[in-house]
Structures are given as C-alpha cells and as structure tokens.
Amino acid sequence: MRVVVDEIVFLFLKEYKIPLSNKLESIIENLKMNPHMYAMIADKENARHFIINGVDFGYFIEGDTIVISNCKFVKSKWRLRVKWE
C-alpha cells in the first residue's frame, strides 16, 4: 500500500502551523496495514476519515493507493473541498 498526502492538505497544515508529523506517521503506518480501519463517510466503502488534535482528515482508497485528500477543523463550519475524479 502506498499513502499519498494531497498538496492541499499539506498547505492547510502548514498555513495553520499544525504540528502533526509524529501522529500522522503512526496513522499512515496503521493505514498501510489496515486501510479499512477507520470510520466510513456517508456509507461509501472507500471513503473514510480519522481525527487528530481537532483536525478531521478524509481519505479514500483507490486500488493500492490511499489518498488523504481533505481536512477540516472538527468544530468549524469551514471545509476544504476537493473534487474526486
């Protein structure tokens, strides 16, 4: 399994100066072993999410690749929207 962090997620973390490197690394290692480990989004088998330090990350599974494609603050109405192709 390969895990890809989308550029928009990287820029979101950098802009808000959110240090998650150690926790995100452990989550990525868990995703490589069991990609279906976290909760589904809207009953879609391949769209899932996890939360670290008040930031909700969404990812989807596409073949042998896991793409962390969006994120938002848990207690905020603002969201980062990404088109899925």
Language model features with spans:
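Arg/Lys-rich, positively charged N-terminal/basic patches that mediate binding to nucleic acids
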Residues: 1-27
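Enriched for short, Lys/Arg-rich terminal
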Residues: 2, 51-56, 60-85
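Short histidine-centered beta-strand/loop micro-motifs
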Residues: 13-15, 40-42, 60
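Generic cytosolic/nucleocytoplasmic N-terminal low-complexity/intrinsically disordered segments
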Residues: 22, 45, 74-76
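A short, surface-exposed loop/turn module that caps and links secondary-structure elements
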Residues: 26-51
